[in-house]
């Protein structure tokens, strides 16, 4: 295979890994996807080093190494699924390397996010159902849905302005705590504890915790510890905010 083809193989693998990392995919999945693409491109063995903030790839037997920095990360499981599907189709011979690279570039440019109103409804449904599951009363359902939805919208909106994830989580949890306690004191809510528990659930880093454990079990200790630390920081910000609210009200 010519040098230009080797460069294109590396570019394709690097782009696939970059999109997956930015979409918060597990490290083992990123490495496996890139390895399969390289293997299907000419029986190459890919050598990679993957972290949450950087990606290094090379082909065994060559001197070329490529790297990319990961600056922005968000949960986008749809992109992860799309890249998995594209890699499977490429391995089966449905696409050429050029076609796969083109489709990956198109996927990278996609900015498909759920509209704000749908995010509000989703957060509201999660908040309300969790509140009921944890033993809350049905009369608090509407209030929990409303506060939970508004709290998540505050988190999402403040993140765009502040660009600091942990501060946005603190502000959202602080709003949830204040709204729940005020509603309870005004007689609008009955069980303030269950309302708060339900409302903060959309902020809880469940995906990060799961991926951290999966990376640790797969032997990716660096990424597993860093993901776990990030999840613990998020949980701490939520806890600090609620504790601060209780300190203010009582």
Regions inferred by a protein language model and the residue ranges of each:
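Generic secondary-structure signature for well-ordered alpha-helical cores
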Residues: 18, 22, 39-43, 88, ...
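Core alpha-helical transmembrane segments of integral membrane proteins
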Residues: 112-186
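Generic detector of multi-pass transmembrane helix bundles and their immediately adjacent loops
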Residues: 185-250
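C-terminal ends of transmembrane helices
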Residues: 103-107, 151-162, 210-222
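Alpha-helical transmembrane segments and their cytosolic membrane-interface
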Residues: 72-127, 131-140, 227-238, 250
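Soluble N-terminal domains of membrane-associated systems
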Residues: 1-95
């Amino acid at each position: 295979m010519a040098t230009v083809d080797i460069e294109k193989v590396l570019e394709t693998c690097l782009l696939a890994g970059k999109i997956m990392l930015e979409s918060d995919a597990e490290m083992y999945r990123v490495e496996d996807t890139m390895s399969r693409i390289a293997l299907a491109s000419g029986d190459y063995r890919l050598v990679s080093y993957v972290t949450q903030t950087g990606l290094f790839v090379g082909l065994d037997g060559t001197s070329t190494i490529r790297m990319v920095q990961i600056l922005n990360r968000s949960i986008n499981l749809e992109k992860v699924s799309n890249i998995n599907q594209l890699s499977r189709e490429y391995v089966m011979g449905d696409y050429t390397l050029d076609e796969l690279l083109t489709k990956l570039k198109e996927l990278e440019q996609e900015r498909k996010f759920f509209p704000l109103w749908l995010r509000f409804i989703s957060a509201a449904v999660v908040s309300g159902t969790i509140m009921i599951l944890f033993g809350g009363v049905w009369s608090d359902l509407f209030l929990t849905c409303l506060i939970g939805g508004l709290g998540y919208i505050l988190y999402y909106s403040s993140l765009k302005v502040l660009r600091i994830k942990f501060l946005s989580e603190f502000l959202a949890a602080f709003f949830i705590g204040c709204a729940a306690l005020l509603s309870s004191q005004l007689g609008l809510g009955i069980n303030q504890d269950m309302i708060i528990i339900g409302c903060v659930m959309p902020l809880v880093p469940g995906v990060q915790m799961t991926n951290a454990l999966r990376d640790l079990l797969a032997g990716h200790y660096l990424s597993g510890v860093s993901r776990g630390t990030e999840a613990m920081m998020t949980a701490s910000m939520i806890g600090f905010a609620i504790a601060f609210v209780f300190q203010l009200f009582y």
